[in-house]
UniProtKB/Swiss-Prot annotation:
One of its GO terms (molecular function) is 4 iron, 4 sulfur cluster binding. Residues 25-50, 423-446 are annotated as: Disordered. GO terms for cellular component: cytosolic [4Fe-4S] assembly targeting complex. This is Cytosolic Fe-S cluster assembly factor nar1. The keyword Iron-sulfur applies. One of its GO terms (biological process) is iron-sulfur cluster assembly. [4Fe-4S] cluster 2 binds at C204, C259, C461, C465. Keywords: 4Fe-4S, Iron, Iron-sulfur, Metal-binding. InterPro entries: Cytosolic_Fe-S_CAF, Fe_hydrogenase, Fe_hydrogenase_lsu_C. The gene is nar1. The keyword Flavoprotein does not apply. Component of the cytosolic Fe/S protein assembly machinery. Required for maturation of extramitochondrial Fe/S proteins. May play a role in the transfer of pre-assembled Fe/S clusters to target apoproteins. Belongs to the NARF family. [4Fe-4S] cluster 1 binds at C20, C60, C63, C66.
Length: 590
């Protein structure tokens, strides 16, 4: 297990439940038939040494004994060691540029001998790296590309000298999620489709685990869209598999994310090729994950350290054109690696992807003259938004809830009112639901009621994704500075709260400065209207669906399910068979 996983590094960490329903089966040793009867003394009986218990990520997702992800206990194999072992286990399928910008397989390797390695990186990871090394977000991006794909990075060592053929920015697929989110909210307002209002964002896996295990009444409200990480995995595996004729099992996708919960998301049974590959259902093989491995920002440092590579000493410039492979499909290559910026990472959009902000901008574009009114809640992690018409009437209400303390308040507001068992009792509705009276707003809805929202952006970490549990901490940055600057003394004391807040502000600054780091030749986002950007994304998604011959419903959407607890229930006669079935599912044995 990675040594950097600990409860001290997590925000709003809820420790694992005392009752774990994952049974540890201890079978007696098989006795030899040569001597069925033997007389011996007690002191000569050798004590049994049971093997260490192992719990897979899939087992964790099937358990409701823990509230969130229990990162410090269960996430062991999705680490930098798994990346190194995979790179050394099988050679890389070498790819070269062909005619018309396509990519063909090098004749020196056969498809059965190796794998195609691809990686995706979130903007929060780049911001964390930029703050640590004192570089710009753009330079941090170049460092990551040089490390994963360049000749001085991973390719400089290892058994096969393998590296990653493509390194994709998750912002590209985040654009698709943003546009589809606005569509989903619009459809929910007309009552034409699920989910129920208010729609709750589903990109945070810590929040999803919490809802599935403790509050199943929340599930009808969850957005059905995949997260940018999951959508990127589906995108890469479907297109590469279709265009190059390589099975999904030969494509290995590494995702670098700001939090440990993303490891759990990658282990979800719903996020495999079984959801989109029509052939996989008839094949006896285990379904293939869309995201094979997830590491965090700090684990990226451990990965470089394991190979003896100093990240800040790598070239802070883009890879030469000769080392950059075009994506197999020209249209999708432009979408993934476009030099034009179509969205801006501003403080108004937040540090978690800007789902809520984009919904507001989309509806504002449909209502000329409207204005976005912001009202802060009890703390900085709760913000209410109202889109007001020129006449002062509310068009759309939305909110942002970050951190489990605030999430619990949101859940209480959404919880259905208890039905009284007394004969003749009135059912609590509207303003009296929950046993408390609420003031009435001008449009007739109870003021402050979350049921009045059309959309709520929910994230488990206070401050958003730049404050994820896997981000580089101020202590790590101090250690790095002490190693590379003799004038800086290493501090062993735990950082004070104000120092931690200052460090988070530094990471946020790097995150928001991503647009200012871009070249002057890059098109300003203000020249691209919201409507034009939505049309561009819709055309790209239609093209993706057409070339893969897979409906967009299977590519971009997912499902959720209630996780029932077995704690305190009597053991059923077939418990053993149930455990065997559970362990045999996708990811079993991890």
């Amino acid at each position: 297990m990675s040594a950097i996983l600990s409860a001290d590094d997590l925000n709003d960490f809820i420790s694992p439940g005392v009752a774990c329903i994952k049974p540890v089966e201890s079978l007696p040793q098989k006795q030899s038939n040569e001597n069925p009867y033997e007389v011996t003394t007690e002191d000569k009986v050798q004590p049994e040494n049971p093997p260490p218990a192992q719990i897979s990520l899939t087992d964790c997702l099937a358990c409701s004994g823990c509230v969130t992800s229990a990162e410090a206990v269960l996430i062991s194999l999705q680490s930098h060691n798994e990346v190194l072992n995979t790179l050394d286990a099988q050679p890389e399928i070498r790819l070269v540029s062909g005619e018309n910008g396509t990519v063909i397989e090098d004749s020196g390797r056969t498809r059965d001998e190796g794998r195609i390695f691809v990686a995706s990186v979130s903007p929060q990871v780049r911001a964390s790296l930029a703050a640590t090394y004192g570089v710009s977000e753009k330079e941090a991006n170049h460092i990551i590309h040089q490390f994963l794909s360049g000749p001085n990075g991973l390719r400089a060592g290892g058994k096969h000298g393998s590296g990653f053929s493509w390194v994709v920015d998750t912002n590209s697929l985040r654009e698709a999620v943003l546009v589809l989110t606005a569509d989903e909210v619009s459809e929910s307002l007309t009552g034409s489709s699920a989910p129920k209002r208010p729609i709750l964002s589903s990109a945070c896996p810590g929040w999803i685990c919490y809802a599935e295990k403790t509050h199943p009444f929340i599930l009808p409200h969850l957005s059905r869209l995949k997260s940018p990480q999951a959508l990127t995995g589906t995108f890469l595996k479907t297109v590469i598999s279709k265009k190059l004729g390589v099975p999904a099992s030969r494509i290995w996708h590494l995702s670098i994310m700001p939090c440990f919960d993303k490891k759990l998301e990658a282990s979800r049974e719903e996020l495999t090729d079984a959801a989109w590959n029509r052939l996989s259902s008839g094949e006896p093989n285990t379904p293939v994950r869309d995201v094979d491995c997830v590491i965090t920002s700090r684990e990226l440092l451990s990965l470089a350290s394991s190979r003896g590579i100093s990240l800040p000493n790598l070239p802070r410039k883009s890879l030469p054109q000769s080392l950059r492979l075009p994506f197999p499909d020209p249209a999708l290559n432009v979408f993934l690696f476009s030099e034009k910026s179509f969205s801006r990472q501003t403080s108004a959009s937040g540090t978690s992807g800007g789902y809520l902000h984009n919904v507001l901008l989309s509806f504002q574009a449909r209502n000329p003259g409207s204005e976005i009114v912001t009202q802060r809640g009890r703390n900085a992690d709760v913000v209410d938004y109202t889109l007001m018409s020129p006449e002062g009437e509310p068009i759309l209400k939305a909110a942002r809830y970050y951190g489990f303390r605030n999430i619990q308040n949101l859940v209480r507001k959404l919880k259905p009112a208890r039905v009284s068992r007394l004969p003749g009792a009135k059912v609590a509705t509207g303003q009296t639901a929950g046993g408390r009276r609420q003031p009435i707003s001008r449009n007739g809805a109870s003021a402050g009621s979350s049921m009045d929202y059309a959309y709520v952006e929910v994230m488990a970490c206070p401050g958003g994704c730049t404050n994820g549990g896997g981000q580089i901490r101020i202590g790590d940055a101090r250690e790095f500075n002490a190693q590379h600057d003799a004038s800086v003394t290493s501090e062993t004391s735990k950082p004070l709260p104000h120092e931690q807040r200052s460090w988070l502000a530094r990471v946020d600054e790097a995150y928001y400065s991503a647009d200012s780091d871009m070249d002057d030749a890059v098109e300003d986002v203000r020249t691209v209207s919201v409507t034009d950007n939505e049309d561009r994304v819709h055309k790209t998604l239609q093209h993706w669906s057409a070339i893969t011959d897979i409906p967009l419903e299977k590519l971009a959407y997912t499902t959720y399910r209630e996780v029932e607890s077995d704690v305190g229930k009597p053991s059923a006669p077939n418990d053993t068979s149930r455990v065997v079935e559970l362990a045999g599912k996708i990811g079993g044995g991890w």
